[in-house]
Amino acid sequence: MTSRTEAVKAYLLDLQDRICSALETEDGGARFVEDAWVREAGGGGRTRVIGDGKVIEKGGVNFSHVFGAGLPPSASAHRPELAGRGFEALGVSLVIHPYNPHVPTSHANVRFFIAEKEGEEAVWWFGGGFDLTPYYGNEEDCVHWHRVAEQACAPFGADVYPRYKAWCDRYFHLKHRGEPRGIGGLFFDDLNEWDFDTCFAFIRAIGDAYINAYLPIVQRRKDTPYTPQQREFQEYRRGRYVEFNLVYDRGTLFGLQSGGRTESILMSLPPQVRWGYDWKAAPGSEEARLTEYFLQDRDWLGQ
């Protein structure tokens, strides 16, 4: 490993530890179970899963560091000049699915890629972000989530949050449904526009911001009473989450195409999901308001 890779790996392992500790404390019941694994083609990781807690129905916080002789198609499709290069990929990826329909699902990811070829300069880039998927929308939560995202981006330029917020809105979009997966946040990829140290500092700012963005929302909503019908709606909306991850998500596709660990890759899927044929929310209901108001391309900070 190069010194850069070592520095990124040390940060990601520490980030995984800190996020798991914070989520365990907030749940107050369940503990993460670690499954360390080795990839035959090169590398390995630490999968940590939690479930059946007081707050978290299912969740996972994964670290992986894999390498190989050639980039898989999902990683080189938009950069064909990198096809055939050897690669290293490091990242932390997490998804948290709470029981309570009033607590949104959250997702975060930070990652680092290096593509190398003998006799040529190594090409590196970072990617990541975090996004929120509510089932019953709350404006206070949406504003808080985006405010933390904006504050994390602010030291790196006034244009960074608007650019990566818009990218998130475009990326987490179910084309076949014509709707977004959630209320967005930040998404970026192929980040090497600054020098390495600045890009690495930005990744740390985003990774460190996740807990500050998510835990206050969990704390506000976890004790909100809910009905069996609201739970059913949560499971119905979770179906959209499954559809996106299996059809569009670049991280899922990269993992499967690169021979990654299937159990860890599919850890993001919720435990209870339902699909109903041509289901429609009642006009004027909270369920209808989710798509009509919250799942829209909206400037939550009023900028």
Swiss-Prot record:
GO cellular component: cytoplasm
GO terms classed as biological process: protoporphyrinogen IX biosynthetic process
Active site: 107
Primary subcellular site in the record, as a coarse category: cytoplasm
Reactions performed catalytically: coproporphyrinogen III + O2 + 2 H(+) = protoporphyrinogen IX + 2 CO2 + 2 H2O
UniProt family annotation: Belongs to the aerobic coproporphyrinogen-III oxidase family.
Name of this protein: Oxygen-dependent coproporphyrinogen-III oxidase
Organism: Pseudomonas putida (strain ATCC 700007 / DSM 6899 / JCM 31910 / BCRC 17059 / LMG 24140 / F1)
Gene field: hemF
